[in-house]
């Protein structure tokens, strides 16, 4: 446990480093902390903080900078989020893809870092299904979602079906299962298979199988905006290795998606500093994220990706407000 003096000095050091981006020395801290302490005493406290892994000394400077561990302690115990007057913005309830793209742009423009939004996860609900015969034992399954999205999949069957059988299967599915998820339909079919003719049941089960894959196939898409903002961040512009790693991360997307998936299970804003998540092993990056909802159900996550040296209180506000805007826009879309 840190004593009050050590906490105050660490807080002053982190805030000064975030504001100026330069290693902070003992003389600077003696003026900034408000404590009546000599530079020598402050140096001793800084040495203790360094031993604890909370700050570090760059090779090129006598000053100190916060480590990921130091940032974490600062965020968890010392950060005070003051209400800041952010620009009044609104996300119009348009098509989900447009809302997501606009939200990513809003996050990047407000933060001047990288905005990221994981697209809503769609439950594999269908509104309407049709079958079209392409050739012998080869059929097209046409599935329409509640929001009008159309998915087509080709299936191959062991038996050939007549047009009347295709209509019979489609009518049964539409009359009894429209509005359910494909998983719910699959379970219901298992229970009702004895009531159906065997070949018709097999056709419907094949359709549900490809339908489940089709309706969930666009999940876990992620939209980035403002990647070029990192070119203006000294922490990256002065280190091409860091910059390349960041852009590789955005291009591959997999690690970011895993991190956002973790965030979707949290309540409110969550902060990942450096490589502490072990999902994105990048000490120079932090992610501030929050889930968003549609009609009260969490369907995705959004956030800001930037250097560990960021104004966390401001990022928390930006992410929190944007998540509420997205939730509102998607929930009220008609």
UniProtKB/Swiss-Prot annotation:
Gene3D superfamilies: 3.30.450.40, Heat-inducible transcription repressor hrca homolog, domain 3, Winged helix-like DNA-binding domain superfamily/Winged helix DNA-binding domain. One of its GO terms (molecular function) is DNA binding. GO terms for biological process: negative regulation of DNA-templated transcription. Signal peptide: none annotated. Keywords: Repressor, Stress response, Transcription, Transcription regulation. It holds the Pfam family HrcA_DNA-bdg. Negative regulator of class I heat shock genes (grpE-dnaK-dnaJ and groELS operons). Prevents heat-shock induction of these operons. Belongs to the HrcA family. This is Heat-inducible transcription repressor HrcA. The lineage of its organism: Bacteria, Pseudomonadati, Pseudomonadota, Betaproteobacteria, Burkholderiales.
């Amino acid at each position: 446990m840190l004593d009050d003096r050590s906490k105050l000095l660490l807080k002053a050091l982190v805030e000064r480093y975030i504001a100026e981006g330069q290693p902070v020395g003992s003389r600077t801290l003696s003026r900034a902390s408000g404590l009546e302490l000599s530079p020598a005493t402050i140096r001793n406290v800084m040495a203790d903080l360094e031993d604890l892994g909370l700050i570090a000394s760059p090779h090129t400077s006598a000053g100190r900078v916060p480590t990921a561990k130091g940032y974490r302690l600062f965020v968890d115990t010392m950060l005070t989020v003051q209400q800041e007057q952010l620009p009044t913005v609104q996300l119009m309830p348009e098509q989900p893809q447009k809302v997501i793209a606009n939200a990513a742009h809003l996050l990047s423009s407000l933060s001047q870092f990288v905005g990221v939004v994981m697209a809503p996860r769609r439950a594999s609900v269908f509104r309407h299904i049709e079958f079209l015969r392409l050739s012998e034992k080869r059929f097209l399954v046409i599935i329409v979602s509640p929001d009008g999205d159309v998915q087509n999949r080709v299936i191959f069957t062991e038996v050939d079906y007549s047009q009347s059988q295709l209509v019979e299967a489609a009518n049964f599915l539409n009359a009894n299962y429209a509005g359910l998820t494909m998983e719910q339909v699959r379970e219901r079919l298992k229970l009702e298979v004895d009531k159906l003719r065997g070949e018709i049941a097999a056709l419907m089960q094949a359709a549900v199988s490809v339908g489940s894959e089709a309706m969930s196939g666009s999940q876990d898409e992620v939209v980035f905006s403002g990647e070029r903002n990192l070119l203006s961040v000294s922490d990256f512009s002065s280190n091409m290795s860091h910059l390349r790693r960041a852009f590789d991360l955005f291009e591959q997307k997999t690690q970011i998606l895993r991190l956002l998936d973790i965030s979707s299970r949290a309540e409110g804003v969550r902060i990942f500093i450096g490589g502490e998540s072990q999902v994105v092993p990048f000490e120079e990056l932090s992610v501030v994220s929050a889930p968003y909802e549609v009609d009260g159900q969490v369907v995705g996550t959004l956030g800001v990706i930037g250097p560990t040296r960021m104004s966390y209180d401001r990022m928390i506000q930006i992410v929190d407000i944007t998540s509420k805007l997205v939730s509102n826009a998607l929930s009220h879309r008609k």
